[in-house]
């Protein structure tokens, strides 16, 4: 599984 990137859960 990949970690939440910058624009993934931020917007």
UniProtKB/Swiss-Prot annotation:
It is found in: Secreted, Cell wall. Keywords: Cell wall, Secreted. GO terms for cellular component: extracellular region. It comes from the Eukaryota. This is 68 kDa cell wall protein.
């Amino acid at each position: 599984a990949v970690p939440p990137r910058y624009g993934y859960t931020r917007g």
